Amino acid sequence: MDHRLLEIIACPVCNGKLWYNQEKQELICKLDKLAFPLRDGIPVLLETEARVLTSEESQS
């Protein structure tokens, strides 16, 4: 994931900052507690494709 891209893109729900989880290949919105998948290195920034973070994940 190109870190320059992270400076440009935002959460499609709240327009907040996204954080990259390299282990899970996801972009995380801590405000909405959503994880957006990366498929073949491409962020899928659709709310319908996002998963809700567990309470443990949202606290870290």
Curated annotation (Swiss-Prot):
InterPro entries: Trm112-like. Pfam families: Trm112p (PF03966). GO terms for cellular component: cytosol. NCBIfam families: PRK11827.1. Belongs to the UPF0434 family. This is UPF0434 protein YcaR. The lineage of its organism: Bacteria, Pseudomonadati, Pseudomonadota, Gammaproteobacteria, Enterobacterales. The gene is ycaR.
